[in-house]
């Protein structure tokens, strides 16, 4: 019996998870990536408990944890006074999940280990230098036009998953509006080999509230597993790209986190725009959007990639139910019914709230925000409730309740 074929556009972590999950469900899979290799620039790393459960289902959890850092705690700080406001402990979730912690594993590691596993399947094809330029469909199939090193071709399948990022070719080809807005400031990410835990009493994940310049500070393992720290700052609206990335600006920002007598050792610097946008549709016929192709958000809280992985797992489970006769095609609409409102409620609202909390300028409102965090952290019931939301466990359970 001929297997149903799933075409996945985009070999970032969401596309790779979608492709691997599809192969494991018995689909024929082709994964298309425009670039010559997985993008290994510093990007998302924070992986929440709800997502760890899914990576466990893929059979990758052991390697995933080994290549990252386990982060049980996260902290909020008042940057102007260098005061720790409170600490949250994921161990309070031990009765809710087998993974009561976050794992800091860079996203390219997940993509690479997923591709390695995918290549073990005889009916899975991974193609780099394969840029999707157009898509079309009829009642029985979907076809993607691909430009590669050796020219162009048309590839057909039963379903197509567009996981090709915020500038998604698939989304644009379907003329799907990307509702929302772009923040006026950008984010600059500075990676340093200096160990902040040796400098002051922080943990692996830290959020610094500051009316002038908030900071996210977190540790990742690095490819050599020796550890390095990333600091994320907002730019000033009037700063040019050249000014933001210049050595004097880079070192001034890092020295502003904690002054050192010598310059920081900077391993990488990156600058990007941030958005809050959600596609008005996640499905058109046999074509689906997931990950950044469907939704983008600011990085505070580390929710975007996690939600994208949830998209991929939800979608593949739904496709499998349909092709195996457990449900008819009408079930495919459930993917959008679940994933779009969940993203709006748990990712868009939360990341906007996180940003406003860190950047608040009005003194009374700012103090009230910090006091509220202390109260939540000090109350075991509210502490756990807060973690259920930040860990995305609550979002997964709510999604499952949507019929």
PLM features: residue spans?
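Conserved mid-domain beta->alpha element of the FAD-binding
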Residues: 10-20, 26-28, 114, 162, ...
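Glycine-rich FAD pyrophosphate-binding loop
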Residues: 23-43
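Active-site-adjacent segment of FAD-dependent monooxygenases/related oxidoreductases
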Residues: 43, 48-117, 347
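Conserved FAD-binding catalytic core of PHBH/FMO-like flavoproteins
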Residues: 116, 139-141, 159, 163-274
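A conserved short coil-to-beta-strand element within the FAD-binding core of flavoproteins
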Residues: 128-142
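C-terminal helical "tail/cap" subdomain of flavin- and related membrane-associated enzymes
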Residues: 318-403
